Amino acid sequence: MSTTTLTRREQRAKAQHFIDTLEGTAFPNSKRIYVTGSQHDIRVPMREIQLSPTLIGGSKDNPQFEENEAVPVYDTSGPYGDPEVAINVQQGLAKLRQPWIDARNDSEELDDRSSAYTRERLADDGLDDLRFTGLLTPKRAKAGKCVTQLHYARKGIVTPEMEFIAIRENMGRERIRSEVLRHQHPGMNFGARLPENITPEFVRDEVAAGRAIIPANINHPESEPMIIGRNFLVKVNANIGNSAVTSSIEEEVEKLVWSTRWGADTVMDLSTGRYIHETREWILRNSPVPIGTVPIYQALEKVNGIAEDLTWEAFRDTLLEQAEQGVDYFTIHAGVLLRYVPMTAKRLTGIVSRGGSIMAKWCLSHHKENFLFEHFREICEICAAYDVSLSLGDGLRPGSIQDANDEAQFSELHTLGELTKIAWEYDVQVMIEGPGHVPMHMIQRNMTEELESCHEAPFYTLGPLTTDIAPGYDHFTSGIGAAMIGWFGCAMLCYVTPKEHLGLPNKEDVKQGLITYKIAAHAADLAKGHPGAQIRDNAMSKARFEFRWEDQFNLALDPFTARAYHDETLPQESGKVAHFCSMCGPKFCSMKISQEVRDYAAAQAIEVGMADMSENFRAKGGEIYLKREEV
């Protein structure tokens, strides 16, 4: 039954069943491996795709094979991708980073929650059935201390998180010996610095320079360290979250697990409905990837959805609430200034950012400057105490290609650059959010402007969508722009699902969006020339040429769909070993013909070689034995 035909009760029951029966699961013919670091507790997970051998000759009774190396790939699924790990959503994930956080001895447990709203929720017995049972006691920096990865990097410290990331970014490519797999075209990197081998010191230096961030709140010890930066692999974010009209805690946890399985490097919880606090707790305690939020959404819920009633005090309380739960990065729309709002009046689609429109409405109704801008230093102080990274929101991003690259968009971007420098004064990590809707020929300017205006802080974009004519297919229209801007230097791409502009995505939409954006990110890595990026492509091409169908399925980003499409027309097991597919059939398969041409050429070379030897034999007088000096 399609998810869209289920009732709300049935959807919740289905999600609950998914959670109750959840166990660590590997992709087909893959296994979880761990690469260890200098410390015994630095164990970096990767997925290793096992491949079948290549038939190279012999006879039917005595075939000869050549082994194909297993291909290691980056894995975001955390414990959910390890069949050896017992999963219990009620208890949450293991606290991977807790020993590292404790060993630094610069944070302390709080006697009570700092947020009045959190204290109110915890005191409400009516929420007991919804509440995650194993609540953590939150930590914050000790007085006079800073606990951010940027602070450590500037002090010259290589943290365990940085070593973990260095191993992870190398993707196990040092294991690959085959020259065929290691071959890679030189890329065009537009000034990015892409070392052949990523070291912990390189990670530290990039973070120290502000060119990369490690979103890792000390209250989210379950997360596996990852990095967002121009000189690393392009990352992908997935958005989940309930709304006032649909979705439940069970469904959001299901979407979280599903997102990490299909390659989400980070997940943003954009919940705006009931039980935001409780939903977020379940998500954080079960997330192996960093979690981001837009705090203004929840702050607005606290004032009954009336933007004019927002206050700095309510917003500050929300920041404390979320920081102590473990949110790894906040999207803050502090660049929507009062003087920029009139610039949007001549736009075709005005202000399309939800956070941007909230702050614009507040500014106009009070005729005051954006309180997020006015209190930005206080925001930084809060972030520094928990190591919450800032994602400076593009509240004035274009919502149509007609509005792309206009005065409002770039005015805000320049302000975000000023705010970046302020955040760095507090050792707070920063990335910059970008558009939006931009036609292809105008995309590169966005990257250039961001690098110049925002001092090379990582760029994080929503697409951009390259045309406005394809509702229902905006994962395609935006995937084109995402691949381009990723190539130009964008560090993280926020996925767009087929439901963009139409409705709240379900589980299948999340998968479609992620696959599309993993393609875009990988295409960008190839174009940049990221070391090792081509290994999987080469393995796939070799498997394709050798008609190793099972390996083709297993090397695919989505093995299940690849297999299903093949089996629609060749469902028999014999189709998995056939030297053709249903598109061309046995007589017109280009790969099969190419193999025959190669075999013929090899045979011809042998014949030519034998003819040359024969001619040489005759030229030397037909002697069977030659004198020593003639040899």
Swiss-Prot record:
Its EC number(s): 4.1.99.17
One cellular component term from this protein's GO annotations in UniProt: cytosol
Gene Ontology biological-process annotations: thiamine biosynthetic process; thiamine diphosphate biosynthetic process
Keyword tRNA processing: no
Cofactor note: Binds 1 [4Fe-4S] cluster per subunit. The cluster is coordinated with 3 cysteines and an exchangeable S-adenosyl-L-methionine.
InterPro entries attached to this UniProt entry: ThiC (IPR037509), ThiC-associated_dom (IPR025747), ThiC/Bza_core_dom (IPR038521), ThiC/BzaA/B (IPR002817)
Binding residues annotated for Zn(2+), in chain numbering: H437, H501
Alphabetized GO MF terms: 4 iron, 4 sulfur cluster binding; carbon-carbon lyase activity; zinc ion binding
Xref: Pfam families: ThiC-associated (PF13667), ThiC_Rad_SAM (PF01964)
Transmembrane segments: none
Residues holding substrate: N239, M268, Y297, H333, S353, R354, G355, D394, G395, L396, R397, E433, Y460
Cofactor: [4Fe-4S] cluster
Gene3D superfamilies, per database record: 6.10.250.620, Radical SAM ThiC family, central domain
Binding site for [4Fe-4S] cluster: C581, C584, C589
Alphabetically ordered keywords of this record: 4Fe-4S, Iron, Iron-sulfur, Lyase, Metal-binding, S-adenosyl-L-methionine, Thiamine biosynthesis, Zinc
The organism's place on the tree of life at top rank: Bacteria
Top EC category: lyase
Pathway stated in the Swiss-Prot or TrEMBL entry: Cofactor biosynthesis; thiamine diphosphate biosynthesis
Catalysed reaction equations from the record: 5-amino-1-(5-phospho-beta-D-ribosyl)imidazole + S-adenosyl-L-methionine = 4-amino-2-methyl-5-(phosphooxymethyl)pyrimidine + CO + 5'-deoxyadenosine + formate + L-methionine + 3 H(+)
HAMAP family: ThiC (MF_00089)
Subunit field text: Homodimer.
Purpose of the protein: Catalyzes the synthesis of the hydroxymethylpyrimidine phosphate (HMP-P) moiety of thiamine from aminoimidazole ribotide (AIR) in a radical S-adenosyl-L-methionine (SAM)-dependent reaction.
Family in the record: Belongs to the ThiC family.
Name of the featured protein: Phosphomethylpyrimidine synthase
Source organism of this protein record: Salmonella choleraesuis (strain SC-B67)
